[in-house]
Amino acid sequence: QPLEFHKDLTYPNIGPRDSYLLYHEELESLVKNFPTIKRARFWMTFGQEYLTHLRVIQNIGMASIEPINYNGMEIVPLQFLKAVLPNPQDLGENYEGETSIGCRIRGIKDGKEHTYYVYNNCSHQAAYQETGMQGVSYTTGVPAMIGAMMFLKGLWKRPGVWNVEEFDPDPFMEALNKYGLPWHEVFDGDLEL
């Protein structure tokens, strides 16, 4: 069942949050390109109020993509819902708190088990002041811009189709620091895995 698996995970400067195990397409290419990975998971947080809204939308049929007849017109419930709900771009001013995106890694190095955590927190308010958008949009747009810049500078350019993890990560990580998404590292900490 969707959102069936969840547990509390602690996020830096945020604290514990109920985190849900989800599918994310990035996991497919990561395990393909790093075949020694034994387990890769994607966790995301949702507030209970948000989840309640999602359940209600699903239960009353508004998440459907199947057309229905309404007053002699064919409409798609999900498209109708999108038309009547506020534009997410208009909500950024009221967002508070931070996003937290990271990788929690456990493995063997030099015969010993180690953990490594690399993460970034992004303030919704700071992102809004800079761009007029909230932190989720910021943490989506800045890495995409950096990837395009890596390509245009020839740092990430070779014949064929490649995933980002197949390129040198160092210039990308340096650019994250430069363009507003500084990252932090924790070595051999408790990762709640």
Where are these regions (language model features)?
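C-terminal catalytic/substrate-binding lobe primarily of soluble NAD(P)-dependent oxidoreductases
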Residues: 1-193
